[in-house]
Each structure stands twice: as C-alpha cells, then as structure tokens.
A protein has these predicted regions:
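Extracytoplasmic/periplasmic soluble domains downstream of a signal peptide or transmembrane helix
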Residues: 36-50, 55-165
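Extended boundary segments
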Residues: 2-48, 163-164
Length: 165
C-alpha cells in the first residue's frame, strides 16, 4: 500500500521553520500556510497550491523583502549551492539553490509550477521556489530562486551539516 498523503497545512498557521545560513547564522523564520497579507505579516508564506515539504513537486514560499521583519531583505545575496533548511519538528529538509536570483513580473505565476521550466528543470522532482518583491522598497517585479531537495533526516539525528558549519 502507498503511504497516506500528509494532512493539509492549516491556513495562516505556522508549520515549519526555515533557516538560510547565507543570510546569517541566526536567520530563521516561521513558515505559515498561505500568502495573504495578514499571513505574510507574521513570517514567510507557503503558496497553498504547491506541494508540501519534501514531497514531489514544488514547495513554494513567499516573503517580504522590506517590512514585517524584512525576512528576505538580503535575497539578492543567495547563490547556487546555498542551503535552505526547513524543519517541521519531525524532520529536517535540506534544499540546495541551483541558480542566482531570477527577476520577473508578478504575473509570471509559472515560477511556482510543479516543474518550474524557467528554472531549467525539465522533469518532475522535489523542488523549492522562494519569491520576494523587487525592487527592495517596491513591488513592480519579483525575485525568484529555485532549488532541489538534497537530503532529509529525522530531527533526532541532530542538525543537518548545513547548519553545523
């Protein structure tokens, strides 16, 4: 029998913590379900129509660049090879960024498709998409980074390598 699909995340509720070492050793933000304004005031928002952590498809997350804690203020510093680590309290999920930030228009919703083709991906996988506004104090464009799931491990086994450097 196939494993049961995970239960849906609860709207506007936190379900994970995200760590991006490139943005600082103390940088971590809650990830909540949904991308409504009130949700993004509290942390990062998971696009509800995208896959869940570690699942096949595209786990996509939005965050403000400025305002509400400036979670993605330093987004342009992200580089290929950078780790994005998430935990849901049970497991660690380490994604690795594959490309430098890509600038596009807000109407370019294909960036969060299950296989985001502008990323260069051509087949199904376990992907991560991060989105934020550009310019820093505006919202005429979006910056996007894409990554792939590199590893998972239970929380009991300790922090992943990317957080121990």
């Amino acid at each position: 029998m196939a494993p049961e699909p995970p239960a849906p995340y609860r709207d506007a509720r936190p379900f994970a913590l995200m760590y991006i070492p490139r943005l600082g050793s103390t940088w971590n933000k809650p990830v909540l379900e949904g991308t409504k304004t009130d949700t993004l005031k509290k942390g990062l928002g998971h696009y509800a129509n995208t896959t869940q952590l570690g699942q096949k498809g595209n786990f996509a997350v939005a965050g403000h660049r400025r305002t509400y804690g400036d979670p993605f203020k330093d987004f342009p510093k992200l580089r290929p090879g950078d780790a994005v680590v998430l935990t849901d309290g049970d497991d660690w999920f380490t994604y690795v960024i594959d490309k430098r930030p890509y600038r596009t228009l807000p109407t370019d919703v294909q960036v969060i498709d299950p296989v985001p083709t502008k990323s260069g991906y051509t087949r199904a996988g376990r992907y991560l998409t991060l989105t934020t506004c550009d310019p820093e104090w505006g919202h005429s464009h979006r910056l996007i980074v894409w990554g792939h799931l590199d590893s998972t491990q239970p929380v009991e086994s300790g922090k992943p390598e990317a957080l121990r450097r």
